[in-house]
Curated annotation (Swiss-Prot):
The keyword Transmembrane applies. The gene is NPF2.6. It comes from Arabidopsis thaliana. This is Protein NRT1/ PTR FAMILY 2.6. InterPro entries: MFS_trans_sf, POT_fam. Expressed in roots.
């Protein structure tokens, strides 16, 4: 898989990234162990948060699912802030160090809520109407802990990938690190969703969260231990600044006449701006006293280069395609929470002595994604290339991901309809509200959504790296992450809307129609796929001339 990410890894490389000779392979174990520990710590509590809120804070199931979506969205959106802070002000190493410490404080505070009874409401039977609600102080401590944990995790997630790749000079070595980065992330995610979640539910919450504290502390100590070996990159300024300059400069010159003469534009390559979005060509239009005698720009907020204008146009062109990610990931975000709720009211026994934790169900998706990323890179894509002579484009891969996503929601709807029929017939396990239906029925849709993610997530990241301006490639991954984060908020808003307009999502889903919710997602997915196909039909690749040489630039996640 090393060759499949070479171009994307090179996008992470920063020119003149070090003021001294350092970095190299000696930094590899420090970076990887840091990633493993911090990922294990964060996902160890985040993946089982719904169950913790229901069992220990007496929250209703739907409310707990919405809280998970809110904080998961925050975790995905914060990497953009971390990336901007690293690029513009501090560099990657300090941002990772501070983020790791913030994450540790959050996890420690969360662990304290399991040790002190005063930080939790009085325990009662789950789903009882007499349960005591948490006080404002208890919620304040809880939300502070979760927020700190999310800020820390978000600040280091993709910044650590950039810092790790910047330790190497050769593109091949950077590609190798990038592969190990994503492999380690998925490995840690799988372990946290199984071992740590199992410890939380079968030993104690304090023991499980204690493991998260230990993992975070290990990651922080290892990262500090390797600090003297790291290559420290220089802050190069925010890549978004030049985009804002184009807007301001074009508005200031809105009355100027657009010229077709290349001499009227500020360009180092002696070219004129393209005809599309001609209004913004004014930003590169030279006027009196805007260029100094040495060729430099007097005021960068009044005059931009042609390249800056074209970079801005590239962002505008790709926005419609990228927006399709919003509804592509929204059903996945909803499925993430609803699947846990479904698992809680299904037979999770696997043999006489083992019970699958509801919070561990998502590991099926993680493992499915891991497996099919390898299948795609090693078998499917090369086979397609032999048949057609071309490698699948990022847009084609994203389109396939759309189809699998829709299929997963449809299968989940069918499974839930079957479960509700069993509930209506009164087939429960003993006197509980758990339907006499194995949770293994949820495995097929979770596998299918994982297959879809193996197509669309790497495809979206590859599309951003290829088509976003070169100055933005180091933060392209965080942009994708922000959109996924927004999806968690849109999923929460959609749940609110469904609750207000229907009776499909009561706190006890045995009396609801979660299957109808999934069918709504299927309809929305089909409409979104149609929108995506229309956008892709009109879209022209910015770097099409290099496609034949870089078709194997498939980002693995």
């Amino acid at each position: 898989m090393s060759g499949s990410v070479s171009r994307d890894a090179e996008a992470l490389k920063s020119a003149d990234s070090s003021t001294r000779r350092s970095g190299g392979r000696i930094t590899f174990p420090f970076m990887i162990v840091t990633l493993f520990g911090l990922t294990l710590a964060t996902l160890g509590w985040l993946q089982n948060l719904i169950v913790y809120l229901i069992e220990e804070y007496n929250m209703k199931s739907i409310a707990a699912a919405k809280i998970l979506n809110i904080f998961s969205g925050f975790t995905f959106m914060f990497p953009a802030i971390g990336a901007i802070a690293a690029d513009s002000f501090f560099g990657t190493i300090p941002v990772i160090l501070v983020s790791s410490f913030i994450s540790l404080v959050g996890v420690v505070l969360l662990a304290l809520t399991t040790l002190f009874d005063s930080l939790r409401p009085q325990a009662c039977e789950t789903a009882s109407k007499l349960c005591q609600a948490p006080t404002n102080i208890q919620l304040g401590v809880l939300y502070t802990a979760i927020t700190l944990g999310c800020v820390g995790a978000g600040g280091l997630r993709f910044t650590l990938a950039t810092a790790g790749a910047n330790q190497y000079e050769k593109t091949k070595d950077q590609g190798s690190f990038f592969n190990w980065f994503f492999f380690t992330w998925y490995l840690a995610a799988s372990i946290s969703a199984t071992a740590i979640v199992y410890a939380e539910e079968n030993i104690s919450w304090s023991f499980g969260f204690g493991l998260c504290v230990a993992a975070n502390l290990l990651g922080l100590i290892v990262f500090i231990s390797g600090k003297k070996f790291y290559k420290h990159d220089k802050p190069l300024g925010s890549p978004f600044t030049s985009l804002l300059r184009v807007i301001f400069a074009a508005i200031r010159k809105r009355k100027a006449v657009v010229s077709t003469n290349e001499k009227d534009y500020h360009s180092e390559s002696k070219k004129t701006p393209t005809k599309s979005f001609r209004f913004f060509n004014r930003a590169a239009l030279k006027q009196d006293d805007e260029v100094n005698s040495d060729g430099t720009i007097h005021n960068q907020w009044r005059l931009c280069s042609v390249q800056q204008v074209e970079d801005f146009k590239a962002v505008i062109r790709i926005i419609p395609l990228v927006l399709a990610i919003l509804f592509l990931s929204t059903p996945i975000a909803m499925q993430l929470g609803l699947t846990v709720l479904q698992g809680l009211v299904m037979d999770r026994r696997l043999g006489p002595h083992f019970k699958i934790p509801a919070g561990s169900l998502q590991v099926i998706t993680l493992l499915s994604t891991c497996l099919f990323i390898i299948v795609n890179d090693r078998f499917l894509y090369p086979f397609y290339q032999k048949l057609t002579g071309k490698f699948p484009t990022p847009i084609q891969r994203v389109g396939i991901g759309h189809v699998f996503n829709i299929l997963s929601m449809a299968v989940t709807a069918i499974v839930e309809a079957k479960r509700l029929k069993i509930v209506q017939k009164g087939h429960f396990l003993g006197s509980s509200s758990v339907a006499d239906m194995s949770v293994l029925w949820l495995f097929p849709p979770l596998v299918i959504v994982g297959i879809g993610e193996a197509f669309h997530f790497p495809g979206n990241v590859a599309l951003c790296y290829q088509e976003f301006p070169e100055s933005m490639r180091s933060t392209a991954t965080s942009i994708t992450s922000v959109l996924i984060g927004i999806c968690f908020y849109t999923s929460t808003a959609l749940i609110d809307l469904i609750q207000k307009t229907t009776a499909w999502l009561p706190d006890d889903i045995n009396h609801g129609r979660v299957d109808n919710v999934y069918w709504i997602l299927v309809i929305g997915g089909v409409l979104n796929l149609g929108y995506f196909l229309v956008c892709s039909w009109f879209y022209k690749y910015r770097n099409l001339e290099n496609a034949d040489h870089e078709q194997d630039a498939n980002v693995s996640h």
